[in-house]
From Swiss-Prot:
Interacts with EGFR (ubiquitinated); the interaction is direct and may regulate EGFR internalization. It is found in: Cell membrane; Late endosome; Early endosome. It comes from Homo sapiens. PROSITE patterns: ANK_REP_REGION, ANK_REPEAT, UIM. This is Ankyrin repeat domain-containing protein 13B. GO terms for molecular function: ubiquitin-modified protein reader activity. Ubiquitin-binding protein that specifically recognizes and binds 'Lys-63'-linked ubiquitin. Does not bind 'Lys-48'-linked ubiquitin. Positively regulates the internalization of ligand-activated EGFR by binding to the Ub moiety of ubiquitinated EGFR at the cell membrane. InterPro entries: ANKRD13, ANKRD13_C, Ankyrin_rpt, Ankyrin_rpt-contain_sf, UIM_dom. Pfam families: Ank_2, ANKRD13_C. GO terms for biological process: negative regulation of receptor internalization. The keyword Acetylation applies. ANK repeats lie at residues 47-76, 80-109. SMART domains: ANK, UIM. It comes from the Eukaryota.
């Protein structure tokens, strides 16, 4: 609603009063207008920006401070899909980035606390269970899947209590962080106690989550980022990865040959599942570098490995303003001299001109096919039991956030006992739900409910044996001691030094790049073979056959891995200072990589042909016998 005095004014001042004041950096008048509360603080201007987005893009710090203090949403995206924080980084203004980052973290905490009662109600209604979520990483590039570790999340749910055990903690300084941790969520009436149990250090960090009684200033003070955190953002590219599913379609996978094809089903952890393929899934990665110095831009380019050069990725580079010639510059925030009348006129076409620092953007797009294994008879409910847990984990875990984005689609009926979704351009994540209520492997803290261990009357022996999982895993009883702090552990408050857990994709993206290189320095040169086998420069990774033989052979202390037969021996180092071998040319590296992929593909085709011939032979024999 626009106030009477604003509606009486003509032009942009009347239609977009907050935006107009932001444009002219009149922060004192903006404060009065916002305090009056008669204008929507999230109103969009003709270019798809909120007042906060416009203030950030223009670098008007005091206007941004006023809007943030009155609750402007930091998480909103503009028409181009960029957040307020990403636009703040583009300005290179350290104080502005620090301010926006502080309020972003504060608003996340408030939203998380406000959602506690809803989450508690969902947990209260859901049936108790124990389940294991196994994360595996796969890739179409041979041997690359080993660059990401696998992990099994163990989940206990009892009443309003939840516990998740993990060994994969996250990423810090471009490396994968491992440890033995438990996260306990213990619900109360309108609040919850959260414990992070560090089993390696025998320390328990506790925190009470409740929006009521929380002091706003204390929460804001706790969200204050360090200068190091701000500088790390200003010296790294802005990276965002999106899973575009607007054109997604699900189809049943087929099996068999020619006229003998049928809909595919597979057994997954004792459950018969229908296999679906999801097509038209696009993974879009956008990278902005206009805020980086030439030195840091050089580092980013140096991180590009030969592997990234031949991947099947459509890559577009956009220079400043996508090629628009900038002939006059009023300021860094308005390099193409756009006037207020032009900006606020919805009928005026700006073309490639825009506000803010000229954007240097790289966009990578690749199409993927996701897979689903759905069981209609599974005891777990995706919406009632699993979704609340994924929502809780997605707050601070980028992998769970992507899983949540996928399962919120309109999936075919059934529980997804296994899901394979793209995470990055060369990596898929395969998530498998198993050991429900400790039915596959006993869990000391879990025992089956007496009512769930007896098959229903009237069931014959064959049906009992074939559906043992579904009959004996319907319920369980979980020991209350699981949700208590272990004896002998030190108890500490919630304030502690910890790596920032950010659900942005940039740290994860860099961790994967670093794993691909796995060299002592980002300047080390790696060959295609080293990238594919994840070996350090100068080493000789063994062939696929050698690896297979090595698994079956007893361990030998001094075993030296042999180079693959199809790869020519690299030249010896030319001197004591040489850091490793280098192949003769990029063309040779590319040829070797494609050779390796072709061998892998040929092996898959050979196995498929062999299976089809065997099936055809069996069918012919069966027809002959008849």
């Amino acid at each position: 609603m626009i106030p009477a005095n604003a509606s009486a004014r003509k032009g942009p001042e009347g239609k977009y009063p907050l935006h107009y004041l932001v444009w002219h950096n009149r922060h004192r008048e903006l404060e009065k207008e916002v305090r009056a509360g008669q204008v929507d603080i999230e109103q969009l201007d003709p270019r798809g920006r909120t007042p906060l987005h416009l203030a950030t893009t223009l670098g008007h710090l005091e206007c941004a401070r006023v809007l943030l203090a009155h609750g402007a949403d930091v998480g909103r995206e503009n028409r181009s899909g960029w957040t307020v924080l990403q636009e703040a980084v583009s300005t290179r203004d350290l104080e502005l980035v620090q301010l926006v980052l502080r309020y972003r973290d504060y608003q996340r905490v408030v939203k998380r606390l406000a959602g506690i009662p809803v989450l508690l109600e969902k947990l209260r209604k859901a049936q108790d269970f124990y389940v294991e979520m196994k994360w595996e990483f796969t890739s179409w590039v041979p041997l690359v899947s080993k660059i990401c570790p696998s992990d099994t999340y163990k989940v206990w749910k009892s009443g309003q209590n939840l516990r998740v055990d993990t060994t994969l903690l996250g990423f810090d300084h471009m490396t994968w962080q491992r440890g033995n941790r438990s996260f306990v969520f213990r619900g109360q009436d309108t609040s919850a106690v959260v414990m992070e149990i560090d089993h390696d250090r025998r320390v328990v960090y506790t925190e009470t989550l409740a929006l009521a009684g929380q002091d706003r200033e204390l929460l804001l003070a706790a969200a204050q980022p360090t200068e190091e955190q701000v500088l790390s953002r200003l010296t790294a590219p802005v990276v965002t990865t999106q899973l575009d599913t607007k054109n997604i379609s699900f189809e049943r996978n087929k099996t068999g040959i020619l006229g003998w094809r049928s809909e595919k089903t597979e057994m997954v952890n004792g459950y018969e599942a229908k296999v679906y393929g999801a097509s038209n899934v696009e993974l879009i990665t956008r990278t902005r570098t206009e805020h980086l110095s030439e030195q840091h831009k050089g580092k980013v380019k140096g991180c590009k490995t030969p592997l990234q050069s031949f991947l099947g990725i459509a890559e577009q580079h956009g220079g400043p303003q996508n090629g628009t010639l900038i002939t006059q510059t009023l300021s860094q925030a308005n390099p193409t001299a756009i006037t207020a009348e032009e900006y606020f006129n919805p009928n005026f076409e700006l073309g490639n001109r825009d506000m803010g620092r000229p954007m240097e953007l790289t966009t990578k797009t690749q199409k993927f096919k996701a897979k689903l294994w759905l069981c209609e008879e599974h005891p777990l409910s995706l919406c009632e039991q699993v979704a609340p847990i994924i929502d809780l984990m997605a707050v601070s875990n980028a992998l769970f956030a992507k899983l949540r984005d996928f399962i919120t689609l309109r999936l075919p009926p059934g529980f997804p006992v296994k899901i394979e979704i793209p995470i990055f351009h060369i990596l898929n994540a395969r998530i498998t739900f198993g050991n429900l209520n400790g039915c596959d492997e006993p869990v000391p803290s879990v025992r089956g409910s007496p009512s769930s261990e007896t098959p229903s009357p009237g069931s014959d022996s064959s049906s009992v044996s074939s559906s043992s999982s579904t009959t004996s895993c319907r319920g369980c009883e979980i020991s209350p001691a699981l949700f208590e702090a272990p004896r002998g552990y030190s108890m500490m408050g919630g304030q502690r030094e910890a790596a920032t857990r950010d659900d942005d994709d940039d740290l994860l993206q860099f961790a994967i790049q670093q794993s691909l290189l796995e060299a002592g320095s980002e300047y080390d040169q790696v060959t295609i073979w080293e990238a594919l086998t994840n070996s350090k420069p100068g080493t000789h990774p063994m062939s696929y056959e050698g690896r297979r033989q090595d698994r079956s052979a007893p361990p030998t202390p001094q075993r030296q891995p042999a180079p693959p037969a199809s790869v020519p021996s690299p030249r010896p180092s030319s001197g004591p200072g040489s850091g490793g071998h280098v192949f003769r040319s990029y063309d040779e590296q590319l040829r070797l990589a494609m050779e390796l992929s072709a061998q892998e593909q040929e092996e898959r085709r050979r196995r498929a042909r062999q299976e089809e011939e065997e099936l055809e032979r069996i069918l012919r024999l069966s027809l002959t016998e008849q």
